[in-house]
Amino acid sequence: MTKGLHVPSEIGKLRKVCLHRPGDELLNLPPDELERLLFDDVPFLEVAQQEHDTFAQILRDQGVEVLYLENLVAEVFDQVPGARAEFTDQYIAEAGIRGQHMPQIVREKLDSIEDNLEFVKKTMAGMTKSEIDMPLTASTTLDSLVNSESESDLIIDPMPNLYFTRDPFAVVGEGVNLNRMYSVTRNRETLYGKYVFKYHPDYKDVSLYFRRDCQFHTEGGDVLNINEKTLAVGISQRTQAAAIDVMAQNIFWNSDSKVERILAFDIPVSRAFMHLDTVSVSYTHLTLPTNSR
């Protein structure tokens, strides 16, 4: 495995890619909360995994090294003492857990998972009440009684959008934007990137041009490397102009960056024009059948 990052352009030979294989997070999608979790329908997990595996194998057949986000994070926990405990603290703090006793119950459940890869997958999948044995003091609260009819079985939301791995963090040349994402639903996804770029031996030394604790939001789908010296960024529903200001300052003042100009494209603020990569299509050449008209 080669170390570091190098993406001078979106067009060219792909050598390495980071994916996420759809997992149990899709099983924890409540049908009545799809819109909040940014889904239109509940995918069939088995088919989603089959299609993903086919896609990943096509990449491998073309000589692409396929990495998995869950494996990278698990490798960090395997190799770095204290990293998993640090992650667990932050994960629970950002999980939106309701109830005085529930965070400790969740911690005990997570700590009981010995295998680091299974632990990572569990944090991605979310957690339901049916998975744990809750004492009466935790399961019966004023909040649960008042909201009993509308209360979800979820203790922690799943992260069903994780297979869009470009959005939480995007490579810019030899550095990376670790994004603060538009929605609360997706912003927790960037926590995995934080630990990869903070601790993983292959990626801990790369430059960060944007950090997940920034007050402005941006997503990787709005960032396109045109060439080594030119970066395109969309001003969209998911990326604020102020975020591009922060990004630009960090890129231009970083001695390792080769980017000399950033082009900002103002696109409609709506989900239909979600990102710059939604409204722009890159290709090196177009092939048409000889009988096309």
Language model features with spans:
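The feature marks the mature, well-folded catalytic cores of soluble enzymes
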Residues: 1-288, 292-293
